[in-house]
A protein has these predicted regions:
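N-terminal targeting leaders
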Residues: 1-65
Length: 65
């Protein structure tokens, strides 16, 4: 449930629509991986994930391409 909410938040952000971000969740910990266009975009994705109810922490494994 948290995974789909995080994905929806990321897809709803116009600056991240084309990003290739994978979302995995385990016990409230969200792991973001994949490729992103800039550090600013990565920070935005982490910020959006943290804002989702039920998320206790976010691990950023995204790579800038």
């Amino acid at each position: 449930m948290i995974t789909s909410k995080v994905k929806a938040a990321i897809l709803g952000e116009s600056t991240l629509k084309s990003a290739e971000i994978n979302v995995e969740t385990f016990k409230g910990i969200v792991q973001l991986s994949g490729f992103i266009s800039s550090q600013t975009a990565a920070n935005k994705a982490v910020e959006l994930a943290r804002a989702v109810k039920g998320v206790t922490s976010v691990k950023n494994d995204m790579r800038i391409k």
